[in-house]
Amino acid sequence: MDATHVLCGFSKGLLADLDDLLPPASVLVVEDEYVAAQRDVHRRSAQHPCVAGVVHAPVQDERNPAGIVRAVSRPEHVRAVVPSTEYGVVAAAALAGAWGLPGAGPAAAAVLRDKAALRAHADSAGLPQPRWRLAGSAAEVEDFRAALGGRCVLKPVDRQASLGVLLLDAEDDTDTAWKATTTAEEPRMRAPGTSSGRFLVEERLTGPEVSVECLVHRGDLLFTNVTGKQLRPGPYPVEIGHVVPAGLPAPVTGELTRLMRRLVESTGFSSGVLHAEWILVDGTRPHLVECAGRLPGDSIDTLIDLAHGGRIVADLLAVLQEGPPPVRGPARAGAAIRFLTARPGMVRAVSGLTASRESNGVREVELTARQGTVVGELNSSWDRLGHVLATGATGAEAARNAAAAAALVEVRTS
């Protein structure tokens, strides 16, 4: 098959975008064989006209990126390699580098995919961030947190979607937290044997959280967006809402942009999209949480499109295939998403969907739970049940619209 675009990892949402942007049979999906079977990738990919085929390769073997280069033959007319999942970032950079195409760059991709490597890099680059260390046991976590008054953050170095991330207060048991973090798994998303099995313990900072999305072309920031975040209170910091634009004071936005530019320059990140999360200590001083070298999840790309106009996916393709650099302006409206959750138990009834869809500014309402669905604890992004996406004249108005519409949806469990 002679595809023009290669995707490292299966992403239903990205393929839906590419159906609108690319000709039929132009995309090759590269996925790990185990993950492809678990996620029914062949059948699901066949539902997208843009897909030419699916090939199996060690796309998640980040310790041996040369393996993906040996396993995947270069399509004759390939124009771009796209990291379509978090676990495909290193593979995409490796293929793009080997094939002479624009991309993150192998060295930058390796740093972004390892939270410990990113922490070490941020220290050397002078980027503000929490104090941290690698932890190999509950005892090491206990020693670290004791020096900080007992509060800390515990997380895996190479997972996504807040999986295994725990916020500890002084009274929380270290052994229980260590077990929860070290046993957190994504059996359908992560290939066996590919996780490094390493963990971080970090200083727990306080302040609002935001993410910064940057479109980067040959090391230059073409576009920067700041997304406001709402996190669920409690030990599991699951994101339950986003809003674009965040509506921060201009000096804070300027400082975030300056720090993103330093991150790009210091890592050598070349071309693509960055999605970095920051805590604003005292509401004004950004401290780095983490950074991904791919499109943002949680429909943030859709929020950016609705607020700013244009298509961020089309812009990504432009910088990855050396097209004319896209031009974007400031946000012209607001867009927000609110995620739907429920108490653990079996779903007995669902109501309010019609009213929610008819609410002010609502663009989309999705709910996966049905009568009889078993709802578990809300420990990661994978445990959310759906979302409401809304727009408004400003980010604040969009956030109010999304929250009001989400409040109309009731999922009763027992």
Where are these regions (language model features)?
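Domain-scale detector for complete catalytic domains at protein termini or as standalone homologs
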Residues: 3-75
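Short beta->alpha connector loops
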Residues: 8-14, 87, 135-139, 205-206
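Conserved N-proximal alpha/beta basic substrate-recognition cap immediately N-terminal to
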Residues: 41, 49-136, 384
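Conserved ATP-binding module of the ATP-grasp superfamily
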Residues: 128-130, 151-154, 169-206, 239-242, ...
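Short beta-strand-to-turn element immediately C-terminal to the catalytic PLP-Schiff-base lysine
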Residues: 135, 165-170, 215-217, 281
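Acidic/histidine-enriched active-site and ligand-binding environments that engage anionic O-linkages
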Residues: 145-154, 223
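ATP-dependent carboxylate/phosphate-activation module, predominantly the ATP-grasp catalytic core
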Residues: 196, 203-269, 273, 280, ...
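Peripheral (often C-terminal) accessory segments that flank ATP-dependent C-N-forming ligase machineries
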Residues: 317-414
